[in-house]
Swiss-Prot record:
This is Fluoride-specific ion channel FluC 1. Na(+) binds at G77, T80. InterPro entries: FluC. Keywords: Cell membrane, Ion channel, Ion transport, Membrane, Metal-binding, Sodium, Transmembrane, Transmembrane helix, Transport. The chain crosses the membrane at residues 4-24, 37-57, 67-87, 98-118. Fluoride-specific ion channel. Important for reducing fluoride concentration in the cell, thus reducing its toxicity. The lineage of its organism: Bacteria, Bacillati, Bacillota, Bacilli, Bacillales. It is a multi-pass membrane protein. It comes from Bacillus cereus (strain ZK / E33L). The gene is fluC1. One of its GO terms (molecular function) is metal ion binding. GO terms for biological process: cellular detoxification of fluoride. GO terms for cellular component: plasma membrane. Belongs to the fluoride channel Fluc/FEX (TC 1.A.43) family.
Length: 137
């Protein structure tokens, strides 16, 4: 049965990477500036989703742990991209876009922490609400 986790992570990873790719293309259709908005928005969304998933969905026990791992490690792990963030930052620095690079790094780190905090807070709130409504885990 442990082979199922590899399949779940693999399939979810493919879906996460494709989602990032197509969402990035869509954002680039409307955003034609130096600032790497697509990667920032995708990474911030991933921070929120992973925190919410691990704080709420995983604790409800409504999905098998292999599915939770598939979503977290596979989908969200391949949807977000630290390597693209790093390369884009170096490219900005190499093109002497110091201000944009600083803004990008700041928004990525602080925004990631804020979005993770919001995902955690929402997950915790929903979990407590779920428990107080009489549905116990």
């Amino acid at each position: 049965m442990r082979k199922l986790i590899y399949i779940m992570v693999g399939i979810a990873g493919i879906l996460g990477a494709l989602s990032r790719y197509y969402l990035g293309l869509t954002i680039h259709e409307f955003w034609h500036h130096t600032f790497p908005l697509a990667t920032l928005l995708i990474n911030l969304a991933g921070c929120f989703l992973l925190a919410w998933l691990t704080t709420y969905i995983a604790k409800l026990n409504i999905l098998p742990s292999d599915v939770i791992t598939g979503i977290g490690t596979g989908f969200i792990g391949s949807f977000t991209t630290f390597s693209t963030f790093s390369v884009e930052t170096i490219q900005l620095i190499n093109h002497f876009e110091w201000g944009i690079a600083f803004l990008y790094v700041s928004c990525s780190i602080l925004g990631g922490l804020i979005m993770s905090g919001l995902g955690y807070t929402l997950g915790d709130f929903l979990l407590k609400k779920h428990l107080t409504e009489g549905d116990h885990l």
